[in-house]
Design a protein with these regions (language model features):
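Flexible "cap/lid" loop of the alpha/beta hydrolase fold
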Residues: 90-130
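Gly/Ala-rich beta-loop-alpha elbow adjacent to hydrolase catalytic centers
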Residues: 81, 85, 89
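Active-site loop/oxyanion-hole signature of alpha/beta-hydrolase fold enzymes
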Residues: 41-80, 243
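Conserved HGGG/HGGXW glycine-rich cap/lid loop of the alpha/beta-hydrolase fold
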Residues: 1-52
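Catalytic histidine-centered segment of alpha/beta-hydrolase-like enzymes
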Residues: 226-240
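Hydrophobic, aromatic-rich cap/lid helix
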Residues: 159-184
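Short beta-strand/loop motif that positions the catalytic acidic residue
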Residues: 191, 197-199
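Conserved alpha/beta-hydrolase "acid-adjacent" motif
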Residues: 204-210
Length: 251
């Protein structure tokens, strides 16, 4: 069962969160801003929050989950994905889910090995299986986010640390999906929904280059870099994110 929460009034908007997260952690600050203009459906991806895991995992099931929520809410529907949720959203649109407009924030790499190096998923899985979720999260933050000792100490003290640790249980499979992903514009010729590709202007150069390549490779997409932001824009500048998205959606 895929859980989702509904709030607001107006056109339908579906939100898809990324890894190490759930609907509340990812969108708690954003949802009230969007709900002034739209009916917002924030889902928990399978294995996260209140959603069940559903047995054997396959990436296509994530895309089917998003498509099922889209089909269950009043049309037309706009779809917003953050990080790994952006990849899920894009793949759902590619598979034929009915989307009026699509918003993606980072998370769609040209080559997923830049996000998830070879072997990382197996190392994370080994730590999780030996009941060391915090060590697994430290590994990812060190090798993917390049956090040094001082930043790791701040991470451990942060308000979202416990939620992130909880998300580690299914992180290895998400890293495996990213490791095998390559962006090929030919796969997305059928994604005709107008698309806004977002990235933080202060995100790593490789992340910005990924966003630029995706925007250039989709049939009807444009790129916007959010000033002063990195990957955590939803938490650090929800108003900026909301204003940018609402303008694109035309609400």
């Amino acid at each position: 069962m895929i859980a989702y929460e509904v709030g607001g009034s107006g056109p339908s908007v579906v939100l898809v969160h990324g890894a190490l997260s759930d609907r509340q952690h990812a969108f708690g600050a954003l949802r009230p801003l969007l709900e002034r203009h739209a009916t917002v459906y924030a889902l928990d991806r399978r294995g996260h929050g209140d959603s069940g895991d559903g047995g054997a995992y396959a990436p296509g099931r994530e895309h089917e989950d998003v498509a099922a929520v889209l089909a269950a809410v009043p049309a037309p529907v706009d779809l917003i994905g953050h990080s790994f949720g952006a990849l899920c959203a894009l793949e759902s649109a590619r598979a034929g889910a009915a989307v009026r407009r699509l918003v993606l924030y980072e998370g769609v790499p040209r080559d997923g090995r830049t996000i998830s190096p070879d072997g990382l998923a197996n190392r994370v899985d080994a730590l999780v299986r030996t009941d060391r979720p915090e060590a697994a999260l430290d590994l990812v933050l060190t090798e993917v986010e390049h956090h040094g000792p001082a930043q790791l100490a701040r991470d451990h003290r942060g308000r979202s640390w416990s939620e992130s640790v909880a998300g580690v249980a299914v992180l290895a499979r998400e890293l495996e999906v990213e490791n095998g992903y390559r962006f090929d514009p030919e796969r997305y010729v059928g994604v005709t929904a107008p698309t806004l590709m977002l990235a933080g202007a202060d995100s790593a150069a490789s992340v910005r280059a990924d966003a630029e390549a995706v925007a250039a490779g989709l049939p009807d997409a444009r790129l916007t870099l959010l000033a002063g932001q990195r990957h955590a824009c939803l938490h650090r500048a929800p108003e900026l994110f909301a204003d940018t998205v609402l303008e694109f959606l035309g609400y």
